[in-house]
Amino acid sequence: VPTSISEDVYQSIRFAQLEHCMVVLHGDAGVGKSKGAQKFLKDHPTNAVGISITPSTGTLSSCIKLLARALRVPECRNKMDQMLALRNRLDGTNQVIVIDEAQHLKYAALEEIRSLTDDNPMTGEHGIGVVLIGNSEVYSRLQGRQQAQFAQLFSRIRMQREYTTRKVKPEDVQKLFPVLEDKKAKKDQEFLLSVCRSPWGIRGAMNLYTNAASANDVSYENLYRMAAHMGIGMLSVV
C-alpha cells in the first residue's frame, strides 16, 4: 500500500534517474523508505537496480562486486577493472542505482559509487542516477563537518530527503488499514497513528494490526492490549 512517504521515495528515485545525480533519502526505520524503493525497482526492471549493504559488504571491493552481480557484469579480479566494466555498462544509459542500508558504506565505496553520476570525461556520455537510502547516519557522515573528505562528497548531493515517524499522516493510516476506515473506527485509527508516529513506525503498526487480526479482534481494546503484549507500551493517542 503506497503511503505519503513511500510515494515521495518513489518520486525522488525518479528524479535521480532523470537528472543523473546523487540523492540521499534518510531517516527513521520502518516508515516506508525501502517499500518505496522496492516499488520503483519492480516498476522499472530494465533501468533500475538495487543492492542492500550490510556491515560486511560496505567496503569498496564488496560493494562493487554486489553491483556487478546485480547488473550481470562479469566480475573482475581487481577494483580498477571492475569499475571500468561497470562504467562501460552504465555510461550513457538511464539506469539508476538504489543502495539500501547505505550507512554501512565505507568512504572509498561512497566515493566510487558517487563517481558513477559524473559524465565520462573521455566520451562525454552522461553518468547515471544514484540513490542512497539509510538511517540519518548516512547523511550526517556525508555532511562531514569534521572530515573534509566527506564534506567533498556532501557537495555533490543534488537532493536529500529526511523521513521521520512524525511525518506519517492520518491519510496513510486510512490507506494502510482500509477495514478500519470502512468502519469509521476513528479511535482505532488514532491509536494506530500514534504507533506509526512512535519509534516503532509504520512497520510496528502493521505488525500490531496483523497480530490483532490473527486473533479476529481489531477493536481498540484488543489493539491496546496487543501493543502492551508486544512491548510497544503505553502510547498517548494523537
What are these regions (language model features)?
Residues 7, 91, 96-98, 103-133:
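Conserved Walker B catalytic segment
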Residues 59-77:
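Conserved NTP-binding/hydrolysis module of P-loop NTPases
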Residues 42, 152, 159, 163-238:
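C-terminal alpha-helical "lid" subdomain
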Residues 18-39, 55-56:
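Walker A/P-loop nucleotide-binding motif
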Residues 76-95:
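Conserved alpha-helical scaffold flanking the Walker A/P-loop in AAA+ ATPase domains
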Residues 2-17:
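Pre-Walker A adenine-sensing motif
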